[in-house]
């Protein structure tokens, strides 16, 4: 099956011209003028901005744990927002059935998101664009927290924390190509004693992120030691409108 990705092609061209014209605010890029926005709204029925995340319990995405049966159990215990396990953008574009199965949503999941992982804005843009078209999802989440070697050594997951310019391209691309919210999940940083999340959080919002989820450990810590709740509180103070 051959699929077209018109929005990804549009934003890729815009970003390629940035070196000459300078970075534009995401709102300006996304609207493209009143006429363009009117045309776009006719072609796509969007859901962006309809979720009030504040005061809700969020079952954060976690590979091999947050599968559909587990999420159903958690919904029974009162969780408000659920999210799929991490899906690799490249695998989705290759049409791998096992990867697409991760995106299945149960009817009880009234607020549901899909998490994507990758390291290239064009690949993640295409994946986000087709997921936005083909799947029932309220938001699409970017994985910047996975610490496993397979993801990290390929430049994805928590490795992105060391490349702010790449994050900018990815988040802005995903925001442009979808009509639903784009959210981000990330860690404190890569190394234990080198926290960088607080410097990135204000930029996430500028780039179009609607929600941030912070895992209070570095990539180096993986899942060991206690989360740094003091640093989480510090990061919370850096947000403006974006819930953390």
Stretches found by the model and what they are:
Residues 1-244:
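Flavin-dependent oxidoreductase catalytic cores
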């Amino acid at each position: 099956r051959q699929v077209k990705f018109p929005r990804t092609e549009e934003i890729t061209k815009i970003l390629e011209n940035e070196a000459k014209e300078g970075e534009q605010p995401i709102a300006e890029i996304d609207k493209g003028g009143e006429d363009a926005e009117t045309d776009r709204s006719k072609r796509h029925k969007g859901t962006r901005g309809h979720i009030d995340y504040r005061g809700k319990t969020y079952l954060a995405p976690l590979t091999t744990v947050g599968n559909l049966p587990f999420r159903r159990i958690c919904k029974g215990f009162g969780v408000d927002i659920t999210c799929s396990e991490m899906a690799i953008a490249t695998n989705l574009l290759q049409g791998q059935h096992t990867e697409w199965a991760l995106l299945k949503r149960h009817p009880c999941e009234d607020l549901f998101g899909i998490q994507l992982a990758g390291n290239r804005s064009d690949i993640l843009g295409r994946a986000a664009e087709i997921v936005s078209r083909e799947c029932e999802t309220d938001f699409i989440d970017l994985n910047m927290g996975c610490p496993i070697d397979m993801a990290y050594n390929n430049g994805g997951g928590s490795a992105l924390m060391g490349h702010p310019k790449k994050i900018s391209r990815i988040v802005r691309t995903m925001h442009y190509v979808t009509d639903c919210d784009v959210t981000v999940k990330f860690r404190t940083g890569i190394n234990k004693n080198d926290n960088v999340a607080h410097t990135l959080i204000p930029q996430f919002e500028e780039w179009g992120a609607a929600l941030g989820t912070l895992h209070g450990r570095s990539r180096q810590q993986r899942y060991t030691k206690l989360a740094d709740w003091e640093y989480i509180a510090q990061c919370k103070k850096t947000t403006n409108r974006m819930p953390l």
